[in-house]
Amino acid sequence: MKKTITIFFTFLISILLYPQEKKKIDIKNADFTYINNEKHPDYWRLIGNVNIYHNETNMFCDSAYYFSEKEKIIAFNNIKINKGDSINLLGEKLNYDGEKGIAIISKNVILKNTTSDIESDKLIYDIDKEIIFYNSRSQIVKEKQKISSNKGRFYIKKNEYQFLDSVVLKSKKYSLNTNKLIYNENENINYLQGPSKIYFEDKTIYCEEGYIFNEKSEFFKNSYIENKDFKINADSIFYSDLKKSIKAYGNVFLTDTINNMVLSGNEADFFEKEEKMIFKNRPLLQLISDSDTLFINANKFENFILNNNNLIIAYSNVKFTNNNIIGKCDSLTYYNSDSIITMYEKPIIWLDEYQVFSDTIKINYYDKKINKMYLNSKPMIISKIDTQEYNQIKGEKMTGNFIENKLSIINVSGNGQSIYFLKEKKETIGMNYLESSTINLVFKNKKINNINYEATPHSLTTPIENLKHKDRFLKEFKWRINEKPTINEIINQ
């Protein structure tokens, strides 16, 4: 019994340690076979309709040298290599090493696959591993695209191509340059690895990782889309060529160099046909100026292209600031054709110590500077003097004029009213109430320096000790300092 077990294990070890001998090359056919053991004992000369079989692979040629001791073939003209239904290799010269299972095909080489062809000067076919690779400029030709590269591999089992070094893809809709491209025939997906640029007729896409699948694409790692008008950067970009839409996530920035504008957020949608953009998730609009950039913060922005001009709508909890003002409203529009910013629903602006509000506020932002401000319904200006003391001015309409983004004059028209508290040696001695059809306020060093009236005003001064609490405030008075956002809240969210 022990002897039987010993013999069995000896046999098993011999199988594991010494692999089975490979099958020898089988010469299936040759019109003429020349064997001369004296002149060339190391090879046979095969001529005419040569058919060689090895490793489940058929090789055809016009003529060949067969080195039987080394299990090698050197073949010439009309080379054809077939393995199953998937591989059909054509060329003019073949070097085949039967011991290694390596076939090197050169000169006018074509690999015909089910749906694509590889054209090359030289292909190396590892029959055992079922890999075909090349190290010189070659291209794959499909029905809708061509891909060329300096190096490449084709994994037969996975039906997958790997293109390396100076990869160029050309199709009807776009062209692509990259360092590495993986194309899977079964999935019909192009995977991009390394710096990649995709050129469409109207835009360029860059990424360092991504994929292209039929009409859908996704791009990661320093990705951006650029056209003649703007550039979109994001952590990841999804592009649908069918819908002509873009979805971007993470650190999304739209840079418009024509209009000196940057729109950012963590999520954005772009609709090319509708010429519309939506920014969400902590969006921020920057109207760029060399001297004083305006920052606008909101819950959502929509940007429309109308007659080649931008209309931007900011929705919900809108806040903005530059070096001189802070503003707040529920919604806002900016149309670059007339450079008008319009504030809606409880709009308010803080100018240093002054609070300015109205039902609606319009700001002329020509040349990226605040030039004029229009308050067209129930406008009021308030500045706080003490706990119960506020200087106030109101009217039917107000127009503010700015010089270099700094308020210089405010004109109040229609039923102008004002309340001013009078001081003597820092003590409040009384309050002046005044009515006038027009009031002009002149500012200097960010404070009211002079007040002018175009008609004789009606004025009443009341000593502080006789002043009733209700008379301290004009109608519609509301001190809204608790709503004032900080600059950091606006810019850094």
Regions found by a protein language model. Give the residues of each.
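Bacterial Sec-dependent N-terminal signal peptides
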Residues: 1-25
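N-terminal amphipathic/hydrophobic interface segments
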Residues: 20-493
